[in-house]
Design a protein with these regions (language model features):
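Conserved acetyl-CoA-binding loop-helix of GNAT-fold acetyltransferases
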Residues: 62-70, 217-222, 226-243, 264
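Short amphipathic alpha-helix that is part of the acyltransferase structural core
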Residues: 1-14, 49, 60, 120-176, ...
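N-terminal charged segments
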Residues: 1-75, 89
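Conserved active-site alpha-helix within GNAT-family acetyltransferase domains
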Residues: 89-103, 231, 255-272, 279
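Acyl-donor-binding surface of acyltransferase catalytic domains
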Residues: 59-142, 146, 150, 276-278
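Conserved beta-hairpin
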Residues: 25-31, 94-102, 125, 181, ...
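Conserved GNAT acetyl-CoA-binding A-motif
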Residues: 76-86, 241-254
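A conserved beta-strand-loop-helix scaffold within acyl/acetyltransferase catalytic domains
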Residues: 157-221
């Protein structure tokens, strides 16, 4: 694992500690902190009910602390999720794995503060737009990741039909209504690449806190892939964050092919986050 510089480590650790509090309450279990949604169905950063070591408590985490957090997660009916910077709590992985949970690595990449972002071409007629709470494209943009990250996504014309179905789903299940206040409050920035008819082809988001942010949720409609849309959305999100006084912009990746895209935008390897296999993605 690549170790990041101490100042960068501190910025990212501070961010990870602060941003969930925009969406959740904190419950402390000794050196571990569990984030709990204050309202069912509310937007959440880190998945519903994830835990992380506190900055001061990281060296003191023990098996009993982990067991107490897991018991509370079961009581809440949420996944037994943990996420932390690897070098912030070096002994925690072994303890988590000894408790029977599978740990995954997610390498981080950071955009150097003064690194210019490249100008990326877009396909004819495609535009980039930051979506407001009342944007007519919002429901479809929130539905798109469910298709983009599906195990067996559709392709071709079937994409549009499935996106329409999922748009009705996220509207009906309260997702759209729950996200709107978050957008209005400035706790989330959602950006989409839109086809000429207004249908989102790719989306991504970031949540700002403490002068830092992590770009995530970058996904492309399967039939619109291989046109550079994910890179364009990522670059536009990074530029937007910088324009709004965010000076630490980073992201995580799971596949080397994705890391190569980020590297072409100027992102450079940093540290590593650890999380539990199968835990919910950030939203």
């Amino acid at each position: 694992m690549r170790r990041m510089s101490d100042p960068l480590h501190d910025r990212i650790q501070e961010y990870y500690a602060a941003v969930p509090l925009l969406f959740a309450a904190a419950e402390d279990f000794g050196p571990l902190r569990l984030f709990v949604r204050e309202e069912p169905g509310a937007p959440y950063y880190g998945g519903p009910g994830h835990a992380q070591p506190t900055r001061r408590g990281a060296p003191r985490v023990g098996a009993d602390d982990i067991a107490r957090v897991r018991a509370r997660q079961r009581e809440l009916g949420v996944p037994e999720a943990f996420e932390w910077l690897a070098d912030a709590a070096p002994a925690l992985r072994a303890l988590i794995e000894a408790a029977g949970l599978t740990v995954l690595e997610r390498p981080l990449m950071v955009l150097p503060a003064h690194r210019p972002l490249p100008a990326l071409p877009l396909p004819d007629g495609v535009t980039l737009r930051v979506l407001t709470a009342d944007d007519p494209a919002l429901p479809a943009a929130l539905a798109l990741p469910r298709l983009a990250f599906a195990q067996q996504p559709g392709t071709g014309p079937a994409d549009r039909a499935e996106l329409s179905r999922l748009t009705r789903e996220v509207t009906g299940d309260g997702t759209v209504a729950a996200v709107r206040p978050t957008l209005r409050a400035g706790h989330k920035t959602l950006l989409a690449a839109l086809a000429p008819d207004g249908v989102p082809l790719a989306v991504g988001h970031y949540h700002p806190a403490t002068g830092a942010t992590e770009i995530g949720g970058v996904g492309t409609l399967p039939s619109a892939r291989r046109q550079g849309l994910a890179a364009a959305v990522t670059a536009a999100l990074a530029a937007h964050a910088r324009e709004h006084d965010i000076d630490t912009v980073f992201l995580a990746y799971a596949q080397e092919s994705v890391a190569r895209i980020y590297a072409r935008l100027g992102f450079r390897p940093a540290g590593t986050t650890l999380l539990i296999a199968g835990q919910p993605a950030r939203s």
